[in-house]
From Swiss-Prot:
Photoregulated by reversible phosphorylation of its threonine residues. Keywords: Chlorophyll, Chloroplast, Chromophore, Magnesium, Membrane, Metal-binding, Phosphoprotein, Photosynthesis, Photosystem I, Photosystem II, Plastid, Thylakoid, Transit peptide, Transmembrane, Transmembrane helix. This is Chlorophyll a-b binding protein P4, chloroplastic. The N-terminus of the protein extends into the stroma where it is involved with adhesion of granal membranes and post-translational modifications; both are believed to mediate the distribution of excitation energy between photosystems I and II. Chlorophyll a 1 binds at residues 76, 95, 209. It comes from the Eukaryota. The chain crosses the membrane at residues 101-121, 134-154. The LHC complex consists of chlorophyll a-b binding proteins. It holds the Pfam family Chloroa_b-bind. Chlorophyll a 4 binds at residue 207. Chlorophyll b 2 binds at residues 100, 143.
Length: 252
C-alpha cells in the first residue's frame, strides 16, 4: 500500500507566493516530493507527498507477501496464488518465460501478416500456417516439440530449485553459462550484453504482460472476424465509422 507522508505548516496558507519542486522517482517506485515555500517567509514551511509503492488499484491494500521488491509487483494477486513462497518463485519465472514467448509469438503473428500484405514476402497467415506442408506431419512435429520443450522445462525447474546447477552444458562440456540471477542467464542468451537492471526488468515484464494480452486478443479477434489484426486494422481504416467492434459484434 502506498505510503503518503504529509508535512505542512500553516504558513503556506498565508498571503505569500508559492514555489513548487518535483523530485522524480526511479526503480519502478514513485518518490515524489512537492515543496511549497512562501517567498520571504520561514524556510521551514513545506508540504511533502511521497508515494513509495505502486498499487494495481488505488486505496486497496497489497497482500503482505507482496512487498514491492519484485519487478512488476503492484500487489495484484486476488486469488492468493503467490502466498506460498515456493509457488511465488515458480510464478515469477513462469510469468517471465511466458511473457518472452508471448512477445516472440505476437511478433511472429503480426509481422509476417504485415510484410505479406505490403508485398515484401509471401507466407501464409498465422492462423493458416498449420495447414501447410512441412518436412514432417503436424503430429510428428508436435511430438518433437513436446520432447524438446519437456527437456528445457526440466532444466529450468532444476535451476529454479538450485540456482546455477545447470549452467554447465551437459553435452558440450567446454561451454557453460556465467553465474547470474535465475531467469537472466546471460552469456549466449544475452548477445548484446544488456545489464539486468531493475528498470530493464520492469520494462520486460510490462511488455511481456501486454504481449500475453495481445496474443489472447489476436485469437479472439480471428474467431470473431476470421481475419488477422493487420487485416482488421486496414478494414477499420477504410471505413472508420462503420467497420468497428460495435458493428462486428452486432452482426452488421
Amino acid at each position: 500500500m502506498a505510503t503518503v507522508t504529509t508535512q505542512a505548516s500553516a504558513a503556506i496558507f498565508g498571503p505569500c507566493g508559492l514555489k513548487s519542486r518535483f523530485l522524480g522517482g526511479s526503480s519502478g517506485k514513485l518518490n515524489r516530493g512537492v515543496a511549497f515555500r512562501p517567498v520571504g517567509c520561514s524556510p521551514s514551511a513545506s508540504f511533502k507527498v511521497e508515494a513509495k509503492k505502486g498499487e494495481w488499484l488505488p486505496g486497496l491494500a497489497s497482500p503482505g507477501y507482496l512487498t514491492g521488491s519484485l519487478p512488476g509487483d503492484n500487489g495484484f494477486d486476488p486469488l492468493g496464488l503467490a502466498e506460498d513462497p515456493e509457488n511465488l518463485r515458480w510464478f515469477v519465472q513462469a510469468e517471465l518465460v511466458n511473457g518472452r514467448w508471448a512477445m516472440l509469438g505476437v511478433a511472429g503473428m503480426l509481422l509476417p501478416e504485415v510484410f505479406t500484405s505490403i508485398g515484401i514476402i509471401n507466407v501464409p497467415k498465422w492462423y493458416a500456417a498449420g495447414k501447410e506442408e512441412y518436412f514432417a506431419s503436424s503430429s510428428t512435429l508436435f511430438v518433437i516439440e513436446f520432447i524438446l520443450s519437456h527437456y528445457v522445462e526440466i532444466r529450468r525447474w532444476q535451476d529454479i530449485k538450485n540456482p546455477g546447477s545447470v549452467n554447465q552444458d551437459p553435452i558440450f562440456k567446454q561451454y557453460s553459462l556465467p553465474a547470474g540471477e535465475v531467469g537472466y542467464p546471460g552469456g549466449i542468451f544475452n548477445p548484446l550484453n544488456f545489464a539486468p537492471t531493475l528498470e530493464a526488468k520492469e520494462k520486460e515484464i510490462a511488455n511481456g504482460r501486454l504481449a500475453m494480452l495481445a496474443f489472447l486478443g489476436f485469437i479472439i479477434q480471428h474467431n470473431v472476424t476470421g481475419k488477422g489484426p493487420f487485416d482488421n486494422l486496414l478494414q477499420h481504416i477504410s471505413d472508420p465509422w462503420h467497420n468497428t467492434i460495435v458493428q462486428t459484434l452486432g452482426g452488421n
